[in-house]
Curated annotation (Swiss-Prot):
GO biological process: intracellular signal transduction; positive regulation of transcription by RNA polymerase II; Rho protein signal transduction
Domain SH3: 1055-1116
Composition-biased stretches (Low complexity): 583-594, 966-978
Spectrin repeat windows: 351-456
Phylogenetic lineage: Eukaryota, Metazoa, Chordata, Craniata, Vertebrata
Record-given protein name: Guanine nucleotide exchange factor DBS
Coiled coil ranges: 503-529
Topological category with respect to the lipid bilayer: Peripheral membrane protein
Assembly notes: Interacts with GTP-bound RAC1. Interacts with CDC42. Interacts with RHOA. Interacts with CCPG1, which results in specific inhibition of its exchange activity toward RHOA, but does not affect its activity on CDC42.
Modified residues (Phosphothreonine): 622
Domain comment in the entry: The DH domain is involved in interaction with CCPG1.
InterPro entries in the cross-refs: CRAL-TRIO_dom, CRAL-TRIO_dom_sf, DBL_dom_sf, DBS_PH, DBS_SH3, DH_dom, GDS_CDC24_CS, PH-like_dom_sf
PROSITE patterns membership: CRAL_TRIO, DH_1, DH_2, PH_DOMAIN, SH3
Region of interest (Disordered), residue spans: 555-627, 956-1033
Protein encoded by which gene: Mcf2l
């Protein structure tokens, strides 16, 4: 790091003293472990400034003092020598050796340590002058004096200036000392200058009294314990300062060598760690400063207590030393604070840079993703609603993206602020800021460009839709003008005014110039849109052409006629009407072939009379009618296509806005426990439905825009895939139950808020059910306007298929509500029919009581007709809401279809039929709600039994066909069965039947009815006692089923549609009627107007009309009742008619 600081210690060099002995080896070894109070600390910049240290920065000695007061504290306490602080006349430090009887007993090591320590205290300048030793031996002997002087002179480590000895005061000792000193003077002079003093006043001649302590007759205030305490504190403080300096040096080195991290987390950790260590260092500095100030106050305490107190030089030196140490600590703290501020700033800038870089990476990724998405939005829409939806999506996308754009711009401003604050990484920040600004501007420009394209598309589609609407309204206007009113002059003038008024609105609604459209909207015109523009323009031109033709025609009609209109007799073929017209009368003219075809389809369709209208008027009216129908077909097609697109979009919206969000971890906290892991229950197979529709339906419908009447083929090609709706509807009760339990979940509310939906999710979950039912309504409308078109048959088949799917869905919904059935309903085959009926039971063998009760108390049963069995269930209504309110069905019994037979008609009620079991051992009388429902059930049961019989026939490969399918009814001369019938008429119960044996068709492999209690779960052929339903009061409901075929009292019956066999030639047939021969099998399809019946000859595949007058008397009293069993026999039971002229008989199945 730049501006690095290092710590150095500065000391003064010690001047050599020729009088001081050399330090021994032990002293030198301990030198590295001692602290001098004069040691100072300061911070200097780098190595260049390290050489600039001067002597003025030094405090005391350079050499490290071998000892400190704490090390020899016990030796100093003996006080055999002390440094009082007094000075000689030339400033020499005075060391006093007081009277100490045990002086000779002091070990040399202790004496040397004390001398070394005391001589190291004064400054270098004072120590250089030399020390004055005052030896007080007034109470000692001469021998001790001599030994003490010689010991001191030999062991004194510094320069000696003078030795003053107060000799013994005793007479003998003083005399002895005088004599001994005279003889040994030369010995003393050779070592040290020694002055033998006899009294204290004589001492005062060498040293002023103010520099001597009180025990030497001076006035110097000295307390040895206080001096020792101060010296220990000062040296301890100096050591603390040194350790603090070393700590700062180590910390500074650590900071200087720290590499800047490359991520936010590491940088934060480094900054936090360094800040924590810096706080610890500052704490130690504050403790050192506090300690120093406390010592300084203690040194100044005597002067503070008494102003007259005199301060000696040593005390002043101590104060100066502490002050210098404090000053250096303050300077060190200031330098460290400055260094730390730079280091902290760099770390903080590094952290800011890492945050900026991390934010830059995130924002850049988001902006790149958004730019890719906006670049992928190339669709300009194919309709006005589609473009509006795209604009809405773009607005939502822009609002959603604004967060990232705002974040990017804020990050760019943050980078600019870092640059203004003189961040060290300007070269890295500046390019990123420019790139962020460029990305934001590029995204904004792309959104603006996209919005401009969609606005252009919206404008173009608005023009196209306006033109389309104008054309449609014009065609509607043309179609709504009644042709008969236009034949008069006033009517023509009124119609002409309508035409001209409408044409005036074309200026503001039409597309004026196609080339201008191409030029103005070139940027959005793709191939599909170009074709759409051309089609709209062509439609507009054709509409204008139609208007101009109508205008010209009306102008001619509106012109005033110059001569009156002459009455003209109508053409005979146009006026011919017969009470019983023959088909040939409508086919007599080539010009009326279309009417003839219409009448062939159904004479009940009344032809429009155009006798008073000219031929040209009739042709024009027909063309205009076709145009009107084409417009209606287009409207139905547009509705079908628009609703299909909206339906697909709604499905996608639900799947993305709700279903996908259930897997979003960010939304997991909003999902309640009851909703977790139940997405498949809530949404069923909606995703499968979406993919089917999105992949197939819109594209298929768009291919039929030009020919809407062909849309039936689109449905037929995909009819099998529509079966997926059955699965969705079967799951709907579970979905709705789950929704009711969790509808107040915050998850749904949040999703609805994000999607901006006004309706809740359950409304959208109902969309598939609504859609599958909507198709049949739209197909009905399309078929209504396409009856004579090419695709009418496909439309009819598609409608029937959709209705079949709806029926299957409805039946399956009932089927899953069955309870109590132990077997697998899937084993019973396809569900064909289901419905509620009133049921009576009749047991022929015993059970008389039950039979009687059954007549009066019908049971309400819900029947399920399968391919292999019919199930009887009891319907139970449920309480609740929605699908929970749907009924359930309790299983009661089932009948195997291999042992079932039916009797189609029961006398007394057109709504009743019979199902009998095991050769009429058990008979169930079924009453349907309406005759139509009864006919549907009978036909379906007949188909099942017939298919089973056909299977038996195919299984019998070794037997030949022995019986004919149909037998003529008896003639008046013979009431016995026909020749081919080898069985006698047998009366069954009270019924007269004419059984036809087909035993020859039955092979040995024919399935046999199961024994009672076997093969069918919970099957009981003894029907339970009738329920006490009550409410049956009509006489019709009390009729015994045996009354169905009683003889007598039956009048002529009206002929009903069905299959019959012709038993004699039609001798009264006309040239224009369908010719019938004996033995032909015919089907009476429907009754037309004017007494005609439309009949289809199944033998020759011819169709035609037969006058009812030729059939009414022949069929006046005929009636038939057919019964069928798949057990290998077919029975035709009919009433023997006494009338002689029967031509048609019901065809045996």
């Amino acid at each position: 790091m730049s501006d690095c600081w290092c710590f150095i210690f500065c000391k003064e060099h010690v001047r050599s003293n020729p009088l001081s002995p050399q330090h021994d080896g032990a002293s030198r070894e301990e030198a590295d472990h001692q602290v001098d109070v004069s040691d100072g600390i300061r911070l200097v910049p780098d190595k260049a400034e390290a050489t600039a240290a001067t002597a003025s920065d030094e405090i005391m000695h350079q050499d490290i003092v071998p000892l400190c007061a704490a090390d020899i504290q016990e030796q100093l306490k003996k006080r055999f020598a002390y440094l009082s602080g007094g000075r000689g006349q030339d400033g020499s430090p005075v060391i006093t050796f007081p009277d100490y009887p045990a002086f000779s007993e002091i070990p040399d090591k202790e004496f040397q340590n004390v001398m070394t320590y005391l001589t190291s205290i004064p400054s270098l300048q004072d120590a250089g002058i030399g020390f004055i030793l005052v030896i007080d031996r007034r109470q000692d002997k001469w021998t001790s004096v001599k030994a003490s002087v010689l010991r001191i002179a030999a062991s004194f480590p510094a320069n000696l200036q003078l030795v003053l000895v107060l000799r013994p005061t005793g007479f003998f000792q003083r005399t002895l000392s005088d004599i001994a000193f005279k003889f040994n003077r030369d010995e003393f002079k050779m070592k040290v200058p020694v002055m033998m003093l006899s009294s204290v006043p004589e001492l005062h001649g060498y040293i002023d009294k103010s520099q001597l302590t009180e025990d030497l007759g001076g006035t110097l205030d000295y307390c040895h314990s206080r001096w020792l305490c101060h010296r220990t504190a000062i040296e301890s403080f100096a050591l603390m300062v040194k350790q603090t300096a070393q700590m700062l040096q180590a910390f500074g080195t650590e900071l200087a060598e720290t590499e800047l991290p490359n991520d936010v987390q590491s940088t934060s950790l480094v900054l936090s760690a360094h800040t924590e260590k810096k706080a610890k260092v500052k704490e130690d500095l504050q403790l050192a400063l506090k300690e120093g100030n406390s010592i300084l106050e203690s040194l100044r305490e005597p002067l503070a207590e008494s102003a007259a107190h005199s301060v000696n030089q040593d005390q002043l030196d101590n104060q100066a030393t502490v002050q210098r140490l404090l000053a250096q600590l303050n300077e060190t703290e200031a330098a460290f604070d400055e260094f730390w501020a730079k280091h902290q700033q760099k770390l903080e800038q590094c952290l800011q840079l890492r945050h900026f870089e991390q934010g830059f990476r995130e924002v850049k990724t988001t902006l790149d993703s958004m730019s890719q998405k906006i670049a992928a939005f190339t669709d300009v829409g194919n309709s006005l609603a589609h473009v509006q939806h795209l604009l809405k999506d773009l607005t939502a996308f822009e609002e959603k993206s604004s967060v990232a754009v705002d974040k990017a711009r804020a990050l760019s401003l943050e980078g600019q602020q870092l640059i203004e604050n003189r961040h060290y990484a300007v070269d890295s920040i500046h390019p990123k800021c420019e790139e962020l600004q460029h990305l934001c501007d590029h995204f904004a420009s792309e959104v603006t460009r996209r919005r401009g394209l969609l606005s252009k598309s919206l404008e173009l589609h608005s023009l196209l839709e306006t033109s389309m609407k104008w054309s449609d309204e014009g065609i509607f206007l043309l179609a709504s003008q009644p042709v008969d009113k236009c034949q008069s002059q006033d009517g023509a003038e009124a119609a002409l005014q309508e035409i001209e008024k409408f044409l005036e609105t074309g200026a503001e609604n039409k597309i004026q110039e196609l080339n201008e459209i191409y030029k103005e909207y070139e940027c959005i015109l793709n191939q599909d849109l170009l074709e759409h523009v051309q089609k709209v323009f062509q439609k507009q031109e054709s509409t204008e052409e139609m208007f101009h033709r109508r205008q010209a025609s009306l102008k001619k009609l509106a012109a005033k006629q110059t001569r009156p209109v002459q009455p003209v007799a109508p053409r005979p073929e146009a006026l011919t009407k017969s009470p019983s017209p023959s088909p040939g009368s409508w086919r007599s003219s080539e010009n009326s072939s279309s009417e003839g075809n219409a009448l062939r389809r159904g004479p009940y369709r009344r032809a429009k009379s155009e006798m008073s209208e000219p031929r040209q008027g009739r042709t024009s009216s027909t063309g205009e009618e076709e145009e009107s129908l084409a417009i209606l077909r287009r409207h139905v097609m547009n509705e079908l296509l628009d609703t299909e697109r909206a339906y697909v979009e709604e499905l996608l919206c639900v799947l993305e806005g709700y279903a996908a969000e259930m897997d979003n971890p960010l939304m997991a906290h909003l999902i309640s426990t009851g909703l977790q892991n139940k997405k498949n229950i809530l949404f069923g197979n909606m995703e499968e439905i979406y993919h089917f529709h999105n992949r197939n339906i819109p594209a298929g419908l768009e291919s039929c825009i030009d020919c809407p009447e062909l849309v039936g083929r689109c449905f037929l090609e995909r009819m099998e895939e529509f079966q997926i709706y059955e699965k969705y509807c079967q799951n709907k009760p579970r979905s709705e139950s789950l929704w009711r339990q969790c509808s107040d979940c915050p998850f749904f509310q949040e999703c609805q808020k994000k999607l901006d939906h006004k309706l809740s999710l359950d409304s959208y979950l109902l969309k598939p059910v609504q859609r599958i039912t909507k198709y049949q309504l739209l197909l009905k409308e399309m078929l209504k306007y396409s009856k004579h078109c090419e695709g009418a048959e496909d439309l009819q088949e598609a409608l029937s298929s959709i209705l079949g799917i709806l029926k299957a869905v409805n039946d399956s919904m009932h089927l899953i509500a069955i309870t109590g059935y132990d077997g697998n309903l899937g084993d019973l085959g396809k569900l064909l029919m289901q419905g509620s009926f009133s049921v009576w039971t009749d047991h022929k063998k015993g059970h008389t009581k039950v039979k009687e009760l059954a007549r009066f108390k019908p049971m309400q049963r819900h029947l399920f007709l399968h391919e292999k069995a019919v199930l009887f269930c009891k319907k139970r209504e449920e309480n609740g809401e929605g699908y929970e309110k749907a009924p359930s069905y309790s299983y009661k019994q089932s009948l195997n279809m291999t042992a079932v037979g039916i009797t189609e008609n029961v006398k007394g009620d057109t709504k009743k039929f019979e199902i009998w079991y095991n050769a009429r051992e058990e008979v169930y009388i079924i009453q349907a709600p309406t005759p139509e429902i009864k006919a549907a059930w009978v036909n379906e049961i007949r188909k099942v039994l017939t298919s089973q019989l056909q299977a038996c026939r195919e299984a019998s490969q070794h037997r030949a066909l022995e019986q004919s399918h149909s037998l003529p009814l008896p003639t008046p001369s013979s009431t016995s069965p026909t020749k081919g019938n080898t069985r006698n008429v047998k009366k069954l119960e009270d019924r007269k039947t004419d059984p036809l044996s087909l035993e020859g068709y039955v092979s040995s492999s024919l399935p046999k009815p199961p024994e009672k209690g076997k093969g069918w779960s919970k099957t009981s052929h003894s029907l339970e006692a009738p329920e006490e339903d009550g409410g049956w009061s009509s006489a019709e409901e009390l009729i015994n089923s045996s009354d169905a075929e009683e003889d007598g009292g039956v009048g002529p019956k009206k002929l009903v549609p069905g299959k019959y066999t012709v038993v004699m030639d039609d001798e009264k047939g006309g040239p224009d009627t369908l010719a019938m021969r004996s033995g032909d099998m015919v089907e009476v399809v429907e009754e037309g107007a004017e007494g005609l019946w439309y009949v289809r000859d199944l033998t020759s595949s011819k169709e035609g009309w037969v006058p009812a007058s030729s059939l009414s008397t022949l069929l006046g009293k005929s009636s038939s009742a057919q019964c069928l069993s798949s057990s290998g026999k077919i029975h035709c039971a009919r009433q023997l008619c006494p009338e002689p002229a029967e031509i048609l008989s019901p065809e045996p199945v």
